[in-house]
């Protein structure tokens, strides 16, 4: 299987996005480090979707974005070429189903937190006020 990827970097850090697996990406200090993580990311993604994992894959860089942002913090400003075209009704339905599955999974995770007011994070203020520290 070939995984088409968009490589976003700032010369020091890398974000590598799997174009055909919405939301799947890896990070690394180098492109090579991010590529090494991609198979595990795709296998995890396929498992989440209820699909069979792949045993081998090739990575194809189909687009590159040089960024001025702090890639190490996962800041991003890339827009994939494949995202520029209008969505078909079928593409919209598939993306909507993924978003709803993600929301349902997040809600299940949130609901599993026994004490939503408990925190292990220290208090921290910004110029906007207190940073949230609980579920």
Residue ranges of predicted features:
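Aromatic-glycine hotspot motif
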Residues: 1-134
């Amino acid at each position: 299987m070939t995984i088409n990827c968009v490589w976003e970097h700032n010369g020091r850090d890398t974000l590598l996005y799997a174009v055909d697996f919405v939301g799947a990406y890896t990070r690394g200090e180098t492109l090579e480090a991010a590529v090494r993580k991609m198979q595990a990311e795709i296998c995890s993604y396929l498992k989440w979707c209820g699909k069979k994992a792949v045993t081998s894959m090739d990575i194809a860089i189909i687009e590159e974005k040089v960024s001025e942002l702090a890639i190490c913090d996962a800041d991003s400003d890339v827009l994939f070429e494949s995202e520029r075209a209008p969505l078909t009704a079928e593409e919209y339905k598939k993306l909507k189903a993924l978003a709803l599955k993600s929301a349902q999974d997040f809600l299940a995770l949130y609901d599993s937190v026994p004490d939503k007011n408990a925190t292990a994070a220290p208090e921290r203020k910004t110029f906007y006020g207190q940073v949230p520290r609980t579920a």
